[in-house]
């Protein structure tokens, strides 16, 4: 590699996958360190992200950058002339992309996951929140090919990764979080994006994720319910 670029992540993490996709769409060569972070915190992770102790972490010339949205912006700014633009050039459109990316992370990412893996009142609460907030996201997509218009950008990357994971998880656990009746615009965008293979080719095989969720569903559910409760 011409530059020292290393990503600390996990093939199981949609947050980590966002950064992988961003690097690949920008044409940046990188080393991937696949860490087992779900039941322990590897020393390498604690060394480079001692504050949040979470993946992903991007190492560029040995300097760590944490948090997936911050990393994606860093990638776009560091390699502005390589690959596609992750954020629009126009200042207003750029601000809107940041707004919707943050909205999705704040309002949708965790509730989608909790909708699949929690139980009882907590699950019903997060199911309702997911439906409402995904409908709000559809408003940003209505009448467009992608969230940013005609080209894939940062919002498409983060939403696609999370929804791809959630659609598989909901099938494993038998929960109806996302479907065409509830979210027709989002499902249409998802299908067309999958068919275009622009992002789909960068996702882990569906069967691999399905088998993992099926094998560890009790452990994942126990972890989520212990952390967030079922009532």
PLM features: what roles do these ranges have?
Residues 1-147, 151, 187, 218-231:
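GST-like domain detector, emphasizing the conserved glutathione-binding G-site
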Residues 36, 154, 206:
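Short, solvent-exposed turn/loop segments enriched in Gly/Ser/Thr/Pro and often Arg
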Residues 76-80, 105, 142, 163, ...:
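Hydrophobic/aromatic-lined pockets within catalytic cores
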Residues 87, 176-180:
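Membrane interface segments of multi-pass transport proteins and intramembrane proteases
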Residues 100-103, 115, 160, 205-209:
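Short acidic/histidine-centered micro-motifs embedded in hydrophobic/aromatic stretches
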Residues 135-136, 163-168, 189-231:
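Non-globular targeting/processing and membrane-anchoring segments
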Residues 149-173, 181-188, 193, 203:
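GST superfamily/GST-like fold recognition
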